[in-house]
Amino acid sequence: MIKSVAWLVLPVVLLGAAAVAPARAQSEYTGQRFPYQAFDRLPATQIKVGGATLEVAFAPGEFALPRNALQAWLETSAKAVSVYYGRFPVASVRVLIVPAPGSGVKKGTSFGTRGAAIRLSVGSDSTEVNLVRDWVVVHEMTHLALPDVPDPHLWLAEGIATYVEPIARVQAGDLTAAKIWGDMVRDMPKGLPEQGDRGLDGTPTWGRTYWGGAMFCLLADVEIRKQTGNKAGLQQALRGIVEAGGNMEQVWPIERILKIGDDATGTNVLADLYAKMGEEPYAPDLDALWRDLGVSVGEGPVTFDDSAPLAPIRRAITAVPAG
């Protein structure tokens, strides 16, 4: 999530000064904006990964896991993003971990206005299993690889993060291809336009923002690979944007982002697809696409048909590119 206005609010329970003081301290690290000044007063640990530096700090509070386990989780996530983009998308990023009740990652928000930053609300009872299963950190780190866009184009930012996150984790060896293709078959229909919907720019619902944006990415990935003989895909387009200086610390119009991505692949796929999906609702035949990609989901596990016409494209999408 980017610069979310919603955040976990920890209630102040009137149990005396001992309870009120920690609550006040905790509130300094929550809210709509990233607490840059408060962060910079905290002791931070540096993690070097993907040519970048992660500055990791913890808001007051305790975790069942040692802090080095949480730091290792961040490093693993950053490595996955670095594999996908060829490097980590920004030179440095502040990462603030705020303890919350319960277990698991409760929320993540990325920021870029005063330097790349990510705030994570993490359950204080989290286990290593919770961290291994988490997708939020890779999602938020992926946001750092795209310039900030005006609100009507939020679907592009959330769609890229939704689409890239599982692929990056497959390329890093943290997920299986069968897992993520099964998830796509299950979830991608959430992005289809409903009755009365407009294009992606004009339908800011949850499904259209996240899964409509992810559907744009999938269609673009497949079409780029068709037009380039499977020599390039969306991954090369997104790497091109990062190499051109595009990241969340910048604010770019969507046309510039798409043009740079298209230039990186030698196609016009992103601009053409935006012309088709930006203003008007577009509903591709997903069932036909899954068949062509050779993805079948029945009662049991996902199966692949490697004789399907687009099976080489399916395999290439999750393969680590050379170089």
Placement of each model-derived feature along the sequence:
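Long, contiguous juxta-domain segments that are non-catalytic but functionally important
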Residues: Q26-D40
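Acidic/His/Gly-enriched intrinsically disordered linker/tail segments
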Residues: P152-D221, Q227-T228, L234, E243-M248
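Soluble non-cytosolic domains of exported or imported proteins
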Residues: A64-T76, T127-V132, D151, W155, ...
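Bacterial N-terminal signal peptides
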Residues: L8-A17
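Juxtacatalytic substrate-recognition/specificity segment
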Residues: P43-V149, H153
